[in-house]
Amino acid sequence: MAARRALKAVLVDLNGTLHIEDAAVPGAQEALKRLRATSVMVRFVTNTTKESKKDLLERLKKLEFEISEDEIFTSLTAARNLIEQKQVRPMLLVDDRALPEFTGVQTQDPNAVVIGLAPEHFHYQLLNQAFRLLLDGAPLIAIHKARYYKRKDGLALGPGPFVTALEYATDTKAMVVGKPEKTFFLEALRDADCAPEEAVMIGDDCRDDVDGAQNIGMLGILVKTGKYKAADEEKINPPPYLTCESFPHAVDHILQHLL
C-alpha cells in the first residue's frame, strides 16, 4: 500500500450506514455536520438500485440529511455509463423506481442484460428471457452482486444470487459496475480530485464497502449497523482499518486521529 497522505475525502455508504430505509442511524445527521465542518470533501457512494437518485435524495432530505444530488455517486450511474460506452440496448431487470435513471436508453430489441435489485421482476418468465438473451451472446451487466441487504424486517436477498444463477446457467461472466469494483471507487474519487491514499471509506458491508476500498489503497472503516453481522471484520484480509459501532463513532475517529 502506498504511503498515507493528508486526508482529503471521505466516501460514505448510505443504506445501512447513514440510514436503514426510512430511519436514520441515531446521531448520523449531527455527525455528518461535524464532518462537513472540516476541510475534507464528503461524497456518498451507494449500490442502491431500488430507486432513482432523485427519489433517494428526497428520502434523505426527509430524514434531515443535508446532501445535494451532485454529491451522490450510484451504481445506477455507473451502469448507464457502461451501457452508453458499449452502445447496447439493455433488457433492464431493475426496480421500476430506478427506471428514470435510464431515460433515453434504447431498450427495444435488447442485445444486453442489465440486472440490479428487482424483487418484483425476479420470476421465472423474466429470468428465462434474460437467460435466452445471454445464450445468444448478449453481455450480462450486473449493477452489483451484493449477497444481501438490510431491511426494516431483517436481511433480504440482494441481486448477487440472481446474477450468479444467470452466470452459472449460461457459463458467462457478468461485468460488475458497482462496489466493490475498483473502477467504481476510482470514478467516485476522480470527482473529488483525490487519490486513494488521501481517502477513507465508511460502510456496513465488509466486502463491498471496506474490502473494495482498501483494495485500491483507501482506508476502510466498518460500522456495526445495517447488514453488519458479528465477526464480519474477520472475513476480509487485510482487516478493516477500523471497526466501530456506528457512523458517529467513525466520524469521531476521523476528527481525532486522521485530521
From Swiss-Prot:
Residues 47-72 form a coiled coil. InterPro entries: HAD-like_sf, HAD-SF_hydro_IIA, HAD_sf, LHPP/HDHD2. Its cofactor is Mg(2+). The keyword Coiled coil applies. One of its GO terms (molecular function) is enzyme binding. Binds 1 Mg(2+) ion per subunit. This is Haloacid dehalogenase-like hydrolase domain-containing protein 2.
